[in-house]
Structure formats: structure tokens, C-alpha cells
A protein has these predicted regions:
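RNA-binding accessory domains that recognize and position tRNA/RNA substrates
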Residues: 1-151
Length: 151
């Protein structure tokens, strides 16, 4: 059984305009007991498909849409394609010089809700700001984090 978020009648309008957030007040019910961060199908009250979203039960934004395409699979290849598209845009904007710094992935702007990657020279800083982003973090490369709190 596919896990689902079913919206209240008339609450699909923002999704039809491609807004990626699903607020808790727009949800009629959740079916299938999805885990925090798990990808669910989002449907209108009449059953029409609206998108694939990461589920965040502890947030006011209970769904963050990964894709509005019914045929898209949300897997490692999905994330690779979205990351490659974000990189290609930064290259087009001449933001990829090795000594520079920029925001390589900017969450919803790059169709990766809750994921931010900043680059400062040879260092990358990854922020996972939602349950769906954390749930799918097994797709990220291994890294070493050195944190110094002493100033």
C-alpha cells in the first residue's frame, strides 16, 4: 500500500501552482503510517495525484514536495540529477571557481526542500533542515566534520 497524504477539499490550489509546502491544516488524513521523512504520495480530496513529498509529522510543514511528476522515483538517482542541475546552474553563473564560495544547493530554489550546501573554497557545509532531508541523507557522500567551539 502506498503511503499517502490526502488533502482537504479545495486545499490543493497551492500545489497546482507548484508551491512545494503542505501545511498541517491542509491535510484531511494520512494513510499508511509513514515514518518521519519517508516519501509519500500526495493526493487531492478527490484522489487526483498532486506530487511526491517527504513527510514531516512534527512540523507545521508536514509535507515538502520532491516532485510533481507521478512517474518520478524518489531515489539516489533523483537526488543525483537535482544536485547536477544545481551545479550546472552555478557553472552557468560562473560561481564554481575553486577558490570562491557560494551556496551550491539552496533548498526549494533547487527543488531539494530542506537541503542547503554551502562551499567555502575546498570545504562543503551540508545543512539538512527537515525530516525528509535527513531521511534521505544516506545518499550523501561520507564526510569528516571538525568542529571547534573554542573560538
Amino acid at each position: 500500500m502506498t503511503k499517502k497524504i490526502i488533502l482537504k477539499k479545495g486545499r490543493e490550489k497551492s500545489l497546482l501552482r507548484r508551491h512545494p509546502w503542505i501545511f498541517s491544516g491542509a491535510i484531511e488524513r494520512v494513510e499508511g503510517e509513514p515514518l518521519p521523512g519517508e516519501t509519500v504520495q500526495v493526493t487531492a480530496a478527490n484522489g487526483d495525484f498532486l506530487g511526491w513529498a517527504g513527510f514531516s509529522p512534527a512540523s507545521q510543514i508536514m509535507g515538502r514536495v520532491w516532485s510533481f511528476d507521478i512517474n518520478e522515483r524518489i531515489d539516489a538517482d533523483f537526488f543525483k540529477k537535482r544536485i547536477a542541475a544545481a551545479w550546472a546552474l552555478r557553472e552557468k553563473l560562473s560561481l564554481t571557481a575553486p577558490e570562491g564560495g557560494c551556496r551550491l544547493i539552496f533548498s526549494e530554489a533547487d527543488q531539494l526542500p530542506g537541503v542547503i550546501v554551502d562551499r567555502f573554497g575546498k570545504f562543503l557545509i551540508l545543512q539538512l533542515l527537515s525530516a525528509p532531508a535527513e531521511f534521505n541523507s544516506s545518499s550523501r557522500p561520507p564526510c569528516i566534520l571538525l568542529r571547534c567551539s573554542s573560538g
